[in-house]
Amino acid sequence: MNIRFTDHPPLDPVQEGRNVQARGAAILAADAIPMFEPAITVSYQSSGRTLVVGSAEQALPWADRLAGALPVTVLLLDSQQTMPVRPYPVQVARTVAVAGWLGAFEARWQAPGQPVQQGRFDLVLDLSPSRLIPSHQRPHGYYAPGYDEAARDEAVETMLEMVGDFEKPKYFAYKERTCAHGRNGQKGCSACIEICSAQAIQDDGDRIKVNPYLCAGCGACSTACPTGAISYAFPPAALTGKRMQAALRSYREGGGQDPVFVLHDPEHGAALLAQLGDSLPGRVIPLALQHTASTGIDVWFAAVAYGAAGISVLLTGREAPQYAALLDQQMEIAQAVLGGLGYEGPHFQLLRVDAPDELAVALRHAPRGRTPGEPAVFHLANDKRNTLDYALEHLHRHAPVKPEQVALPAGAPFGAIEVDRKACSLCMSCVGACPAGALQDGQGAPLLRFIEKNCVQCGLCASTCPENAITLAPRLSFMETRAQAVVLNESQPFHCIRCNQPFGTLQMVENMLGRLASHPAFSGHLDRLRMCGDCRVIDMMEPRDEMRVTALRRD
């Protein structure tokens, strides 16, 4: 159990009764808004071609059961003196590799003394000692029940029904233009790739590629994404925000105090909460999500702006282990912002429990943080950065303390950059690399401008800079200049010594002269580095005291 305990005033029975009634109204208000809305779907087609992998003892009995209804192929991982006779293909395989999803699995295997073989299958029953597909979230159509007989029986029963056409929602939307994964071959943000428990997101050069067939809909990628380039679409953040806003409005109207949302999944988390009965504190409002990793600081800030005294996120142990670390990091960032604005906390609680008595204890110590004096009326946007702007503007306007800026931990999606002016040559590589439009050139003048509001701290500018002149500075600024283009560096322009046209900066030319002075290509021609590109070519093509044929004397 991972919870943050805080001391709270003794329970007032009268107020607790009001809270319970107000919670009932809040739940009804949230339920009146659909949890989902129509979405784009992803389709699968399965004809039932089934691959069973395992030892003869483990695989053949289950293959026999499946073969009565499905076309089966078996790969045995142990040597056989005599190959078992079956009405379906049985082979011995030393190595087996499987990849894919329902209706589109590709398997490669090699039998002793034989070349590598391959086949396509719709379903896979993996009874091998180590799973062939190791991802935490398994692809649809892939079953690896381990050694538990009940789990194997359940898997086989499910597989018998997996023939036909199937569909699921497309859980994500991706805007390549704002993705901070890479620019010009330089790598920046890989948060979504690293967090995905289904291995559905891959590097694709300067962008990412999301496989909708592997995506399991956890939404952790959208929580980790600093720009909002990848967003959760089932449900979108705007719909979750509507449910929160409606619930809090009804809770306030019912006389409830200090409301806290407990975000849970609709299956295991909901079942755990249902076991609490009257032990559930009146001010705790359960709110089901498709997955508990699908919300982060944008939705949480909005909830606090709407009047929520806290957010508890319930993990039941079935989630990928990296999700807890992600949510903990998000809570650290969010609490740093609220604390810096003078909102006494804590406001956030990460619960990792699998028993109702543990959950009851944890929720009795649910957050009771300070909230704005006036609840916000804005609606969440499906664009993450817009929602953050709305929420932070409201929180700052009503904040007990109004600092110019709040220091944030590393990994926060807000901040500035520091430029070493002595090292920076104003080559503008960083401007071309910035995916968020935070860095801008001088429109012909040798200067570097920066809009802090746009910066997502992806680090592409720092990794691109050839002079290593850029350092990230995570923080959240509330100064008016945050949305303005401020000059980080400027230099006097350098004019071509031949045509007098500006073509760079004095510092850039001096750096080139220092680095290339001893280069044989410029031996005796260093002045060419002081020329613009056109004049440099002209100078190279002009004759230098060469003897012309016409100048030769005839005898």
Segments and roles (model prediction):
Residues 1-29, 202, 206-240:
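Helix-enriched interaction subdomains in cytosolic or periplasmic regions
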Residues 282-285, 308-309, 316, 327-357:
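Long C-terminal interaction/binding lobes of large macromolecular proteins
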Residues 212-215, 219, 452-458, 522-539:
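Cysteine-rich micro-motifs
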